[in-house]
Amino acid sequence: MKQKWKQKLPGILLGLVFLVGLGIFAYPTVADQWNKYHQSRAIASYEETVADMDEVDYQKLWEMAEEYNSQIGNNTFDGDAFSQEEQNMRGSKYWSVLNPGDNGIMGYISIPKIEQRLPIYHGTSEAVLQIGAGHMFGTSLPVGGEGKHSVLAAHRGLPSAKLFTDIDQLVEGDKFYVHVLNKVLAYEVDQILPMVEKDDTDTLTEAMKNVEGEDYVTLFTCTPYGVNSHRLLVRGHSVPYNGEDDEKAIANESMLQTVKDYYMLYAILAVAAAILITVLIKIIRDRKASRGSKEGGK
């Protein structure tokens, strides 16, 4: 018996090493696909909630958001979304604005260039930044308007989700879209600050300030990839939403992402199935060989 185990041990260890290696290799992809599934479900739930509303509801929530923006005036914040403390926002005025599902989702952002769609949550707590984009408290709510500047933050380089990992691929002229209630707001990238020290509050504050007559949205994340000692800011200014042309870009992005997600999922399942089948065949063969040796010894 001991001799048989000694013979099998190298194969077992090799199999375990292979499985561990496969797990490490597949984890980022599997985790990202899992997060994208939940992000898609969150966006779908938001769209269903919005679809059940009528024009009066839209108008009421939109006016509340514009009133909130008027009351806060110029952006007020500590300069870094990732240093904001997590607060219990439920019951606050901020939480009640642009929150049709009472789940903290105020809309979602679509970035066709990098094939990314993320729900936008109230605030930038760590819990929020792990699963989507967060609206930076103290900046304008993302409903547009002259003299408004909304800041949306998300992590970059998480092993479990891509989020804003690829926004360094954006260049001036690229567009992104903010979906809020029954409206789609289009923004064109016009400024990129690729490397700002996280403690350089003067530069960060200047980059995210309100500018009279302008309607801005800034995408805020950490950099360099995996180091996170600096901040990357991608700013876009409001441009007309071209309806059919822009919808085509959004639809193509969504369809392409769905196809990629399914192919990746099927590939992972196929590899897992192949490993399982191989292991089962090995077990069956070993049992047959063991039975044969026992019968031969009788």
Question: Can you name each region flagged by the protein language model?
Answer:
Residues 7-11, 24, 30-42, 121-292:
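Extracytoplasmic/periplasmic soluble domains downstream of a signal peptide or transmembrane helix
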